[in-house]
């Protein structure tokens, strides 16, 4: 058996505790940390996640809640719809109130509708 094959065989026979101790011993001897590659990989993944962050949202009225008249007033103010159209939108929930809104605008609309008593989703 070659030296490398013997090392592989010996490592395969270690218990979990022995393997952990071996890892610590090698870290000390070589002056490295086993956690470093994980941290580097996580740091490399963060910019990719930030690049994929959603910038446009659809504001969806999930349910009007108990204060339907207040919700209709807010929908009219937000969308500029007439009374009948706003009423139909609210009663037909779930419906999209605003499409492709910026993150700030979507959050503002959501807050307005929730204050009026509606249940709102951002997609």
Curated annotation (Swiss-Prot):
The record's annotation in SUPFAM superfamilies points to: ClpS-like, Ribosomal protein L7/12, oligomerisation (N-terminal) domain
Keyword Lyase assigned = no
Give GO cellular component annotations, separated by semicolons.
cytosolic large ribosomal subunit
Q: Could you cite one Gene Ontology molecular function of this protein?
A: mRNA binding
Known CDD domains for this protein? Ribosomal_L7_L12 (cd00387)
Q: What are the protein's UniProt keywords?
A: Ribonucleoprotein, Ribosomal protein
Q: Which GO terms describe its biological process?
A: translation
Which InterPro entries did the record assign? Answer: Ribosomal_bL12, Ribosomal_bL12_C, Ribosomal_bL12_C/ClpS-like, Ribosomal_bL12_oligo, Ribosomal_bL12_oligo_N_sf
Source taxon at top rank? Bacteria
Listed Pfam families: Ribosomal_L12 (PF00542), Ribosomal_L12_N (PF16320)
Subunit details for this protein? Homodimer. Part of the ribosomal stalk of the 50S ribosomal subunit. Forms a multimeric L10(L12)X complex, where L10 forms an elongated spine to which 2 to 4 L12 dimers bind in a sequential fashion. Binds GTP-bound translation factors.
Q: Do you know which PANTHER family this protein is assigned to?
A: 39S RIBOSOMAL PROTEIN L12 (PTHR45987), LARGE RIBOSOMAL SUBUNIT PROTEIN BL12M (PTHR45987:SF4)
UniProt family annotation: Belongs to the bacterial ribosomal protein bL12 family.
Known function: Forms part of the ribosomal stalk which helps the ribosome interact with GTP-bound translation factors. Is thus essential for accurate translation.
Q: What is this protein called?
A: Large ribosomal subunit protein bL12
- The organism named in the record is Parvibaculum lavamentivorans (strain DS-1 / DSM 13023 / NCIMB 13966)
Q: What is the lineage of its organism?
A: Bacteria, Pseudomonadati, Pseudomonadota, Alphaproteobacteria, Hyphomicrobiales
């Amino acid at each position: 058996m070659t030296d490398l094959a013997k090392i592989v065989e010996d490592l395969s026979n270690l218990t979990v505790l022995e393997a952990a101790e071996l890892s610590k011993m090698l870290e000390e001897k070589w002056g490295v940390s086993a956690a470093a590659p994980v941290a580097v990989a996580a740091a490399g993944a963060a910019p990719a996640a930030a690049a994929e962050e959603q910038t446009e949202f659809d504001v969806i009225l999930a349910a009007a809640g108990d204060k339907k008249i207040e919700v209709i007033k807010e929908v009219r103010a937000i969308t500029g719809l007439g009374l009948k159209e706003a009423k139909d939108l609210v009663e037909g929930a779930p419906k999209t109130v605003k499409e492709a809104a910026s993150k700030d605008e979507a959050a503002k609309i959501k807050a307005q509708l929730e204050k009026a008593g509606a249940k709102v989703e951002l997609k």
